[in-house]
Amino acid sequence: MRKFKILPLLLLLLTMATSAVAQKKTQKTYIPWDNGKLVVSEEGRYLKHENGAPFFWLGETGWLLPERLNRDEAEYYLEQCKRRGYNVIQVQTLNNVPSMNIYGQYSMIDGYNFKNINQKGVYGYWDHMDYIIRTAAKKGQYI
């Protein structure tokens, strides 16, 4: 008799777990810029989107992200930030001048001459920074 009391409870728990997993798989990434650019409110006290939707800045500080993490580590870090609800990742573009990324590439290869900044086959400093920005954008995060 006790088995019959537990069976409906187990079926209910199984149904709830299956529903939660299915819902998580179909959940889309919220892309905040679908609401337009960020603008300062009329009274100058907060940020909002062009369409009037409020913007809540929940930031994580990954200051040395472009210099210390490779692409796999950066993707993992940004995913962890997304799971925790961070929508802004604050990084330093240049910690020093020149800065060097994890791949040993300098931010200022030839002084301030940016003509040959991205070399083929190399994760250059600015190429790596672009990768981080694109990866964050796919996760609905501002850099």
What are these model-predicted stretches?
Residues 1-25:
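Bacterial Sec-dependent N-terminal signal peptides
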Residues 28-143:
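Active-site-adjacent substrate/metal-binding segments within catalytic domains
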